[in-house]
Amino acid sequence: MSYIITTLGNLVHQSAFFGLTWGNYLMVLVAFVFLYLAIKKGYEPLLLVPISFGMLLVNLYPDIMLAIEDSSNGVGGLLHYFYLLDEWSILPSLIFLGVGAMTDFGPLIANPASFLLGAAAQFGIFAAYLMAILMGFPDKAAAAISIIGGADGPTSIFLAGKLGQTKYMGPIAVAAYSYMSLVPIIQPPIMKLLTTKKEREVKMEQLRPVSKLEKILFPIVVTVVVVLILPTTAPLVGMLMLGNLFKESGVVKQLAETASNALMYIVVIILGTSVGATTSAEAFFNFDTLKIVALGLIAFAFGTAAGVLFGKIMCLVTHGKVNPLIGSAGVSAVPMAARVSQKVGSEADPSNFLLMHAMGPNVAGVIGTAVAAGTFMAMFGVM
């Protein structure tokens, strides 16, 4: 009888109820909110479901992220091994491979001026870098945090790993992916504030057709030019363009389909759950995390505003041929930011179709954010 009582007592004491803190329970509630937003509201479920479930797991059972060196038997927690792939920058690069295989660069090729809008939206990154330094973050940490302004989760994780800022990787990744998911909420008020109804009603001419040869040459030329100028961009830009070459060449359909479907979804599952698992209460509830979340929001808002303002300049220069709304799509949240440009434009004029025009700056923003990350790596001598 005493054996049974002792056994039951051990089982009760080994349950999560005795090992969790108030912070863990609070993070569990945050995970529930994220799951609600993903499942009920449909806010980027492919990202938020695995992230929020990883958040849930690590706060119910912290040892699921136990490092190998901290374990008594030399075996780490399951999600720790997933996380190592983030830390080594493997998963972010594979995400870029999949994104490349899914992306049509035709709108950018048809309207090369879109590169300027994609570049303008990167202003938020460098503004956040300066603000992070002013708020007391070290140079490398400030650089890793600032990439949130590009609304690009994989690049944020990639740069944090390359610059050795794994301490901040969890908050950075969660902030970046959260803002990617909340693009439809954050961007419209800024876009409407900075434009007039007349500007939002501007109709743009149909883009010219892009030949197959142009689409094949584009990833090759971009890789050669960008990597020659900034070699540190090779992992991200190289994988992005390789995936796109798979798609556009037409001779490796199996590789293109695998990269854009099976491989992409497997990587998203592993990346999402491991990113969510970095949000333990101990790691997340501190003043630095609050500053990172605030800086990320400011950077994203600045990037959106810079894109719209540059779009207004282009509208003026072209005598009303460019709708400023497409400038907000210069952040690299593909294709969410382009859809937001379309939505805000159609609210002003239901017959206005901006989606394909907005896709140009949108895909340019993906390249721009990767270049910004490569620039920071070059600044700090990291290869």
Regions found by a protein language model. Name each.
Residues 39-48, 67, 81-82, 102-117, ...:
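Interfacial helix-loop-helix linkers and transmembrane-helix boundary segments
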